[in-house]
Amino acid sequence: MLPLPTDLPEPELSRNTAVVLQKRYQRKNPDGSLEETPRDLFWRVAAAIAAQEAAYQSPYSPEALAREFYELMTSWKFLPNSPTLMNAGTDLGQLSACFVLPVGDSIEEIFDAVKYAAMIHKSGGGTGFSFSRLRPRDSRVGSTGGVASGPVSFLRIFNTATEQIKQGGTRRGANMGILRVDHPDILQFIRAKEKEGEFNNFNLSVGLTEAFMQAVEKDAPYDLRDPHTGEVAHRLRAREVFDLLVKKAWQSGDPGIVFLDRINRDNPTPDQGEIESTNPCGEQPLLPFEACNLGSVNLARFFTPGHENEADPARNGVDWTELARVVHLAVRFLDNVIDASRFPLEIITETVRKNRKIGLGVMGFADLLFQLNVPYDSPEGLALGERLMAFIQEEGHKASAQLAQERGPFPAYGSSVYAARKAGPYRNATVTTIAPTGTLSIIAGCSSGVEPLFALCFTRNILDGERLLEVNPYFEAALAQAGMCSPEIMEAVAAKGSVKDLDFLPEDLRRVFVTAMDMAPVWHLRMQAAFQRHTDNAVSKTVNLPHEATEKDIFDIYWLAYKEGCKGVTVYRDGCKSVQVLATGEGQKAMEQNQGAAQAADPGADATGEPQPLPQEAPTPSLSAGVRRRPDILWGFTQKVPTGLGTMYLTVNEVEGCPFEVFATIGKSGHSITAKAEAIGRLVSLALRSGVNVRDVIAQLKGIGGEHPVFRHKGLLLSIPDAIAWALENHYLHGEHVGMVSDIQGQVCPECGEALLFQEGCLTCPACGFSRCS
């Protein structure tokens, strides 16, 4: 590797960037101590990628280009995907994030795919599969005389294998499973995730065809075909299947949808086969045994001050010259990654280098809009998004054409659609992709992908249970400019995460600083479509919906995605998974009502789609059934409470509006006090989960004395248990809801305990950078 230059500047790191780099990317010694600094890390990556120039007649020397790549990354204008940051310049050397593997119809082919997936997950990649080639359940198997298990049964094997790799690897395996809508087992597949926790290592999507969508529009039947024989196995009404897709997405967010015919219309190498699947987050359609390496340009870094209020924000306020320079360097970087990467299978190496697909995308779009004073949900916002991506697409293809002159086109160019159109030649079969950037955006200090901000403020866990208020810097600057930057205002914003209903703030500020849940869902979809129109591959984007959204809202989003030319869409209704709770008492009653409603709409089916026998008499519950199980998803609030031992943050999560569990943390109090607070929280939680009324809990805790009482505006707080009682009493008995610091809704981060956000088709933690996908 090229030696580290002594004059190389140190990267400027925020606290968040430093923490994420140290935890996830900097190499460590066997004892866990850090082997490299952030400067070492970025030079390792830059040098390893620039070294590939030596194989070509390049205008750059490897040393000079390594410096440019280093500056590109440490200025936070561009970052490659996580496997490149982790593995470039290491012995592993696997630098790609996305792979697609074929699943054939024989046992040998199926378990080859399981083995190959394990190898890819071990190396840090994610995998996509189509199960559409598998013969349907209960089909006759000629070689044995038995019957086929069907796609969903084998899907469970893939999920279990991934679970084992997750336990041993440094990066969690992620999968996409796709089944064509005309497969005979499609109803079972759509219902596969009805039971929460099933197939938790998979994103599932239904592959919709043009024939199916036309049948939906006409409310006509369509054919289900046995993939083994090609014969029509059954017919279903398309509208009923589409409505079932909508219902399941409303209930749990799964499955998503992809438009397979539309994807294949944009397949640049159709002679090599049909595209059947995508990567786990859905933005990268790939051929079997193909991989793609991704990278993202940080649009927030291309704002030009002084132009933000001009009449045409789609053309002003952006440094287009610098953006073009960065795009050209980024395309060269990503093309070099193909040569630098060591793939886990030889057939993947051959396929990747034959087509040389790259995926250059963006992040920081919402932050750029903030700087330009342009609302996300506005015609101006759409115009800017489309203009930016059209520019990146044009410059990206120019850069790929220049590389083709320098290095030769991708080997499959001669039989590609480009050659037939006399376009190019190009070095890369595809150039652009809008990928999830959850962890990368934390490193770069910007908003994720093309998503709007989920919250303007949120609280972050730091050492010893202390919590720190995080505020979007552009929002904070706008408040300061308006003379309204105060701790009280920040607390008010943090309580909601949004300024939509804070009438004491200026209207123009509230209009610009919109968040994901502030806007009508249609704006999410329109923005996705604006970027899709100028993207070779696809766009990873989540349409966030409020909890009260209806099935019709999701139907409209799906239909608009089809009409607007999107290649797929993922919706997530806030808190949708929390209705599936295993509980007793009132919680059980509510759950049974939910299940009853679901069965009325979808009678006779369980999570496998199998008809169910008549219910039997329920067994007598055991004593252990008295403690309700904790569901994976809860929502609640965090209350800031002063105590004589430090500020306590009391988090209360609820089921059906009733307290279910309590966590108490006290900052800067020492481990002994922290342990006592945790113990009290655990015991209170056990009582609540065992059916003890919150009034009784309050009565037991209230008035317990301590050594360090403090005065509150409504009385004296004597101790930690007394403070917990005070907070519960004010919230549940008096209904005051005072001092709320943050709303929590969704799944919990397994690494830091913060609430996960569902965006860009992926669960991501805004606090520590954990991501299911990156």
Predicted regions and their residues:
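Catalytic alpha/beta core of large soluble enzyme barrels
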Residues: 15, 283-285, 334-339, 409, ...
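Conserved phosphate/anionic-ligand binding catalytic regions in large, soluble enzymes, centered on
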Residues: 85-95, 99-100, 106-130, 178-180, ...
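Extended active-site and interfacial segments that coordinate phosphate-rich ligands
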Residues: 111-120, 135, 146-159, 192-206, ...
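Active-site cavity-forming subdomains of large catalytic enzyme subunits
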Residues: 6-11, 96-320, 343-347, 400-403, ...
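Internal maturation/activation junctions in enzymes
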Residues: 326-349, 353, 374-437, 507-511, ...
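Short, Gly/Pro- and small/polar-rich lid/capping loops
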Residues: 584-647, 751
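Short cysteine-rich clusters marking metal-coordination/redox-active sites
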Residues: 749-752, 765-768
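Acidic/polar, glycine-rich intrinsically disordered N-terminal extensions of enzymes
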Residues: 1-95, 101, 242-246, 251, ...
